[in-house]
Amino acid sequence: MTQSTVSSTIVEPYAEALMSVAQSNNLTNQIGEDVSFVLSLLQTSDDLKDFLVNPLTPADAQKAVLRQLAESRVQKQFFNFLLLLIDRRRIIFLEGICKYYQALLRKLNNTVLAEVTSTVELTDEQRHAITDKVKHMSQAAQVDLETSIDPDLIGGVIIKIGSQVLDASIRGQLRRMNSSITSLS
């Protein structure tokens, strides 16, 4: 089995189990917020991530750190889920489980994820315009925007919705013009 296959065979059932617990307690969105909180902790602190995924770190130490960081900030069910991941030595898959839970939650709420890459930070007006355009294209009730900056685009934006990519960047236009000119030769 490849690393990806192993990862998905672990990540998906755990995320689905978390969703099941969340649904049975009417906490899907609240646990979604908890998941986002934990993901932001992992993405902003490499030290925390390394500490949690290190197999040599004692489980009691991992639990103590999570108690300090998250116990009072997240739903009891989600905190117990985190402890379960430590007990089962699955905490190394936490980031993947959280991302898959977010995908399940988006599906449940008829929300799409639009990954937007631009040369500069988007204004609120631009975010609103992109959100409206994506809603219209996808027929989704809501849109989650994930933005990133890439100065190599020169200008414009690239919007990725699932497997569909809309390249409205200057770099993309130059690449298409180059292909057209090359094909004429």
UniProtKB/Swiss-Prot annotation:
Pfam families per UniProt: OSCP (PF00213)
Record-level Gene Ontology MF annotations: proton-transporting ATP synthase activity, rotational mechanism
Lipid bilayer topology: Peripheral membrane protein
Entry annotated with the keyword Membrane: yes
Main subcellular localisation: membrane
Localization of this protein: Cellular thylakoid membrane
Cystine connections: none
InterPro entries found in the cross-reference section: ATP_synth_OSCP/delta_N_sf, ATPase_OSCP/d_CS, ATPase_OSCP/dsu
Claim: Thylakoid is one of the keywords in the record: yes
Annotated signal peptide: none
Superkingdom, taxonomy of origin: Bacteria
Biological role: F(1)F(0) ATP synthase produces ATP from ADP in the presence of a proton or sodium gradient. F-type ATPases consist of two structural domains, F(1) containing the extramembraneous catalytic core and F(0) containing the membrane proton channel, linked together by a central stalk and a peripheral stalk. During catalysis, ATP synthesis in the catalytic domain of F(1) is coupled via a rotary mechanism of the central stalk subunits to proton translocation. This protein is part of the stalk that links CF(0) to CF(1). It either transmits conformational changes from CF(0) to CF(1) or is implicated in proton conduction.
Cited HAMAP family: ATP_synth_delta_bact (MF_01416)
Record text on subunit structure and interactions: F-type ATPases have 2 components, F(1) - the catalytic core - and F(0) - the membrane proton channel. F(1) has five subunits: alpha(3), beta(3), gamma(1), delta(1), epsilon(1). CF(0) has four main subunits: a(1), b(1), b'(1) and c(10-14). The alpha and beta chains form an alternating ring which encloses part of the gamma chain. F(1) is attached to F(0) by a central stalk formed by the gamma and epsilon chains, while a peripheral stalk is formed by the delta, b and b' chains.
Protein name: ATP synthase subunit delta
Organism, scientific name: Acaryochloris marina (strain MBIC 11017)
Taxonomic lineage: Bacteria, Bacillati, Cyanobacteriota, Cyanophyceae, Acaryochloridales
